């Protein structure tokens, strides 16, 4: 051990130094509990490089020499008091907070004193500048006055000096001006900083950032756009007129519809809404700005404020095609539109098949036409003719009328072996009402019983005089099956078209007439239209009736899609919003907004018309209440709009005073679930014309046991419905009077009944027949003969001129002088 102590040491021995200052803190809790916690303050360890000596401790800096005039803010803070030895952490925190608050208050007081001193200095400088400016202005005024006096003296000098040519120059004084820009101080005055209070508020308003310091107006309320406009307008008025006089009132042309709100009217007039409300209050009308007023009240307000009114009605929203007339120089020739009309089964469709080289009649139910067909045929001369094939059945009167209204020429087909029939006469009336020329085509001339001359003579009864009888109506004998006379017919059609000079403008937005409309299962609503003017293109926006849409596809009569269709061309249009009515006008408009606007207006008008109550009287109401008319409810669904119209018209024609048809719903397209539900709730049958129910509707039909009636020929439908309605009424009762008698005496018969002694005046009276007892030609009772006796013997009948006694069933109201009428009742099957 001693050897170890004697060895020289090259390194210091390892040991622990005290690197922290330790202490204790006493914690006090509730209920007298305390706790002592050891607290250590760790000192930062300094690492030295090998061979480097630690830096000596910094000596306290010597106190600087006092400045000659130290600023108050440059004073050194007072030395901090040393912390007490036995100070707790809570006391230390409180002491530090108190010292920080005192320091903050002291700094704030120093800043306030600096601001006061700066503001005082600025005020002194401003006062000094104002005095200098005032002095400079006074000197300038004195100089101007001296110059004016010198100029006046020069003018008043004697003229002799002027003759000598030696005019003495006016002495001019140059007074130095103190400030070359006297208005500069005013500019500085405008840029003066806010007052002391404002600066103080800004300083205390929140944290000061660099952006806030650069943008002094940050946070202030910005001037509104209206206020800025008013300020600029005022400045412009002051510059222009030099006065703040009110400007002249501007008179406006105010467009006023049938109903308008007060606020909207104020905007259009350029007035304040409150002024209009005050004026209405003066007129004893308590309204608000958002309240609607009528056109007459708006007119009073517009005139009161000195404006001009322009009245417009809601009808102006609708399209008025009559007002849009094309200039004469824009019109170009167009193909004629020819409608083939005549009685059913006179060969109209067969004639069109012969012209087109097709066979349409084979595909038609019952061999009759029930839709309007539209086709275009090329002639030998290179022209085109558009044909419309109309139904000849009586139920399709509206279709024939539509065909006559859109056509240029009517070809009246009359069968040479049948003659002039009811629908032939109706077609003549439609043609005359439409005011279009007519060509008579006498068909079936190949039959041996054909008599064309008889047809011409029969047409004279209806004021149709053909050319062979020295008239002006062209006629031609044809045979559709043998295809004879067809070329002559086409020549006559072209000749008539040349006389009419048919023209239309192709380079404009299209207008067309709906010939037929239907709801196709795969293509949706489809309308067959005839272009009257313009060109219909794919993508055009249009409105038709109460529906609007966009042309999705244009299909010609051969089933091919085309890009556009010109005047007199029949096409199918896809892309409608709904099924339009046949005969509606299709008009192409600028955009979808315009189309929707017109369609909505028309829908509102249609709803008003549908829901409007018809004018009635008390007599009509009481008659309806007392009448025992039976209603036969029914739903009608068909493939096209024209068939729906024809079926509804035919059903109403079947109705009479005892029973009438009530059509609950009539529409186009397949039978749907809603149709079946409505029929089940109303206990009504569904008539399907060339349509069938879908899968879900068939399930509902089976579940609710709804009666379905399917037809494809219209006269089969009307016959069946007539039988159904007759069955609802029951058999028809036919009364036959067999005898009459007069009551001579009345006797008692048993305890309750009365017997009447009769004298038979006419016919015979039989036991068990129906009888009517009348008194003064008024029926007292209608009953039957319960008992018939003659001289106390029961008999079956009593003939005229004999006396008898009768007992009537369920009546004792018999008096001498009454009359008895005996009759038989026969029940027959009722027909409508």
Swiss-Prot record:
Q: Name one Pfam family in it.
A: IF-2
Q: Molecular function terms in GO for this entry?
A: GTP binding; GTPase activity; translation initiation factor activity
GO CC, any one term: cytosol
Q: Where is the composition biased (Low complexity)?
A: 145-156
Pro residues compositional bias: what residue ranges? 53-71
For region G3, the annotated ranges are 389-392
Q: Which residues bind GTP?
A: 342-349, 389-393, 443-446
Localization, UniProt: Cytoplasm
Region G2, annotated ranges: 367-371
PROSITE patterns with a match to the protein in the record? G_TR_2
Q: Where is this region: G1?
A: 342-349
Q: Where is this region: G4?
A: 443-446
Q: Which UniProt keywords apply?
A: Cytoplasm, GTP-binding, Initiation factor, Nucleotide-binding, Protein biosynthesis
Composition bias, Basic and acidic residues: 89-144, 180-200
Name the major location: cytoplasm
G5: annotated span: 479-481
Q: Where is this region: Disordered?
A: 1-249
Annotated function? One of the essential components for the initiation of protein synthesis. Protects formylmethionyl-tRNA from spontaneous hydrolysis and promotes its binding to the 30S ribosomal subunits. Also involved in the hydrolysis of GTP during the formation of the 70S ribosomal complex.
Q: Give the family from UniProt.
A: Belongs to the TRAFAC class translation factor GTPase superfamily. Classic translation factor GTPase family. IF-2 subfamily.
Q: What is this protein called?
A: Translation initiation factor IF-2
The organism named in the record is: Erythrobacter litoralis (strain HTCC2594)
- Gene symbol here is infB
